[in-house]
């Protein structure tokens, strides 16, 4: 009872600490035991009231471990000697409780739990768990997997990678029941973090296949593990594993996870995974075609990182936030050229900054190089979402927030150049730049010789640092005042780094129509493009542009006239609608599903046009799907509008029924009652592939319209429409 109250008090304190200001609170207090009688948890025994925790927390960690380890060793000894399945289960539960309580400790939980996890391995407990995972009793396997998931710190992952991957993969092949699947997905989530080689082994041996299979389930905890596992696989697996993930359609299977309307943590983890995949240039286009990437920026813009941080702190498996290695993997997202990656990276680091500031461990952000990347986002970003997140993270870390840089660099006056020099750390050269009256035009055309001779930058390394910053500025700059043919965007479509050459080209009087006539020598001597590979790529693309005048806009795939339009009720049918989208895409159909259900204007026209252009109309009938259509005689409801449009255009309507109860026909508006003449297919979550095969038979040229429920033309297994 005391343990429960104390843990609840910890969570409540964390909530208020992260919700509001913490006056003078740079440290966290670790409470002593309850002043009343009774036995407190092992970390509180013997205390004398609140104690301050230093950032290192060495003394507190050591004291906690000295009290905890004897109890852990006793529990492990009992587990080793347990005879029957019931005794084994009791032993596993006792060890699990000790480890879980350690993870929940504020500020020092990671270090204390690390000590317990190491002790379990050194005492033979990890090897014992791997044996118990092969036990014939299902309950024993479930409990052993649950404990193993909790103790997979770095050294324990090493051990499992050496001797236990086969055991884990055999469990993954079982796929059922969901209680076991949850823990196995959690184990895979941790093992994908071990190394690039381990990721490759897991992917090759079926670990990724198991995670992707579980993405079609509905259990929130399982889906969250799947999203985190896919994110870790993408972050730690390297480009070869990322290619394999895309080949196995991981980007598509992330869609229902990112589209979930019930679990924001799940959506964010899924968005992180797909954003990481999109940073791989080899598979970027395939990831874009999945449709999942389009969900990232709107989701990030709609959420509060402070609330997300509180959710992480309140969950036992994420209460300590990410470790330094995991945080280091997020920094490249900030430096990516993709908006989605920058947004999700800034969001996660902002949330982690809130957690680490509460723990007094903000120094880790300097150690991993995140501070400069966050400052660059603030300085160079024209996107309000990622800029606001980066500013918030910097404030939480106690760092100075730089001023945004004006993008119209060619029009800069001397004062803007001075401000930029100060922000990039070159204040000592402000005077020489001022004396030479360097404005935006001169800055963009500055050569290394001029920098050394006229501006006094003698050190070669310093000049390299300066040109690295100048290249970033050139890439970021807006050239619309001097670039009439939009050469900058065309160069950026070849490679985002090529935008840096825009001003040199337009200053020579070049535009897109003349570029193919230029020689490589002219690009070098007149335009200042010193890298030969870049010159060759630009000239090759310019000559190809003669046959394709707008290469940067490229023709879109057949998404303008989709094969299937999916209509669904947002509050009850989004999960099934997103699953249908993935299944149909994997079978070669192009699918339209509206993401945000915007309320007016051009979006309404686009939505109606999408219904009219689609060959088939799939209607998801989830609980209460038609309730808002009743008495909607003005046809203001979205689902009502979509159904009426599909009926009037003679579309092949395929209703999919999932827990739907039919209303009486007369309560529906007359203009949509004809939908009752179509047979529906009952959705089965357990037999999704079989259900999809039935749906595809309807979509491939076989109309689902059938006014007689028992007609010979009705699909086997289809459910007749309307009440009976």
Swiss-Prot record:
Instruction: Summarize the impact of residue 427 to A.
Output: Does not affect phosphorylation level
Explain what the record says happens when changing residue 642 to K: Loss of NAD(+) hydrolase activity
Q: What is the effect of changing residue 453 to A?
A: Does not affect phosphorylation level
Q: Cite the InterPro entries for this sequence.
A: ARM-like, ARM-type_fold, SAM, SAM/pointed_sf, SARM1, TIR_dom, Toll_tir_struct_dom_sf
Q: Where does NAD(+) 1 bind?
A: 103, 110, 149-157, 190-193
So what family is this one in? Belongs to the SARM1 family.
- What does the record give as the function of this protein? NAD(+) hydrolase, which plays a key role in axonal degeneration following injury by regulating NAD(+) metabolism. Acts as a negative regulator of MYD88- and TRIF-dependent toll-like receptor signaling pathway by promoting Wallerian degeneration, an injury-induced form of programmed subcellular death which involves degeneration of an axon distal to the injury site.
Q: Know the name of this protein?
A: NAD(+) hydrolase SARM1
Q: Which organism is this entry from?
A: Homo sapiens (Human)
Q: Which gene encodes it?
A: SARM1
């Amino acid at each position: 009872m005391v343990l429960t109250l104390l843990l609840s008090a910890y969570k409540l304190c964390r909530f208020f600490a992260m919700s509001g200001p913490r006056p003078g609170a740079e440290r966290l207090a670790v409470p002593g035991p309850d002043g009343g009688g009774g036995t407190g948890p092992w970390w509180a025994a013997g205390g004398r009231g609140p104690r301050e925790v230093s950032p290192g927390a060495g003394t507190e960690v050591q004291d906690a471990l000295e009290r905890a380890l004897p109890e852990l060793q006793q529990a492990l000894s009992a587990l080793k000697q347990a005879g029957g399945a019931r005794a084994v289960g009791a032993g596993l539960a006792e060890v699990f409780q000790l480890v879980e309580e350690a993870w929940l400790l504020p500020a020092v939980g990671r270090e204390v739990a690390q000590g317990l996890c190491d002790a379990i391995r050194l005492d033979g407990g990890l090897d014992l768990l791997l044996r118990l995972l092969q036990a014939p009793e299902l309950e024993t396997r479930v409990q052993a997997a649950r404990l193993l998931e909790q103790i997979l710190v770095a050294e324990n992952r090493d051990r499992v990678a050496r001797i236990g991957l086969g055991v884990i993969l055999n469990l993954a092949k079982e796929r059922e029941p969901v209680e076991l699947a949850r823990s196995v997905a959690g184990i895979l989530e941790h093992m994908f973090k071990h190394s690039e080689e381990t990721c490759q082994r897991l992917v090759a041996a079926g670990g990724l296949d198991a995670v992707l299979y579980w993405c079609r389930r509905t259990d929130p905890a399982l889906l969250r593990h799947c999203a985190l596992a896919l994110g870790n696989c993408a972050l730690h697996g390297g480009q070869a594993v990322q290619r394999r993930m895309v080949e196995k359609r991981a980007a598509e299977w992330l869609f229902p996870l990112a589209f979930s309307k019930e679990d924001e943590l799940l959506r964010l983890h899924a968005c992180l995974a797909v954003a990481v995949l999109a940073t791989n240039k080899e598979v970027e286009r395939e990831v874009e075609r999945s449709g999942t990437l389009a969900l990232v920026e709107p989701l990030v813009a709609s959420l509060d990182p402070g609330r997300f941080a509180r959710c992480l702190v309140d969950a036992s498996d994420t209460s300590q936030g990410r470790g330094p290695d995991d945080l280091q993997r997020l920094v490249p997202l900030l430096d990516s050229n993709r908006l989605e990656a920058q947004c999700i990276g800034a969001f996660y680091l902002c949330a982690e900054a809130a957690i680490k500031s509460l723990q007094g461990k903000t120094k880790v952000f300097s150690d991993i190089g995140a501070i400069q990347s966050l400052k660059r986002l603030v300085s160079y970003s024209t996107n309000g979402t990622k800029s606001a997140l980066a500013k918030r993270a910097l404030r939480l870390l106690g760092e100075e927030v730089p001023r945004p840089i004006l993008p119209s660099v060619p029009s800069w006056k001397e004062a803007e150049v001075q401000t930029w020099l100060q922000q990039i750390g070159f204040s000592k050269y402000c005077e020489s730049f001022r004396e030479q009256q360097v404005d935006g035009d001169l800055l963009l055309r500055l050569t290394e010789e001029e920098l050394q001779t006229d501006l006094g930058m003698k050190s070669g390394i310093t000049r390299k640092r300066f040109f690295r910053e100048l290249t970033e500025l050139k890439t970021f700059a807006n050239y619309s005042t001097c670039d009439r043919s939009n050469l900058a965007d065309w160069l950026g479509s070849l490679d985002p780094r090529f935008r840096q050459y825009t001003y040199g080209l337009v200053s020579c009087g070049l535009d897109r129509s003349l570029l193919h006539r230029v020689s490589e020598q002219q690009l070098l001597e007149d335009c200042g493009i010193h890298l030969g590979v870049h010159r060759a790529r630009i000239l090759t693309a310019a000559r190809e542009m003669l046959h394709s005048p707008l290469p940067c806009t490229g023709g879109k795939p057949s998404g303008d006239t989709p094969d299937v339009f999916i209509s669904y009720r947002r509050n009850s049918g989004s999960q099934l609608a997103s699953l249908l989208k993935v299944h149909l895409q994997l079978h070669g159909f192009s699918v339209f599903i509206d993401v945000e259900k915007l309320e007016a204007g051009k979006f309404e026209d686009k939505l109606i046009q999408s219904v009219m252009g689609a060959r088939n109309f799939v209607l998801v009938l989830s609980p209460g799907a038609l309730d808002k259509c009743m008495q909607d005689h003005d046809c203001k409801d979205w689902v009502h509008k979509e159904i009426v449009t599909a009926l009037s255009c003679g579309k092949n309507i395929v209703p999919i029924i999932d827990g739907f109860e039919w209303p009486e026909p007369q309560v529906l508006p007359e203009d949509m009652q004809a939908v009752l003449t179509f047979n529906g297919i009952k959705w089965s979550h357990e037999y999704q592939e079989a259900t999809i095969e039935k749906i595809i038979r309807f979509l491939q040229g076989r109309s689902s319209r059938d006014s007689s429920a028992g007609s010979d033309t009705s699909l086997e297994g289809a459910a007749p429409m309307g009440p009976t």
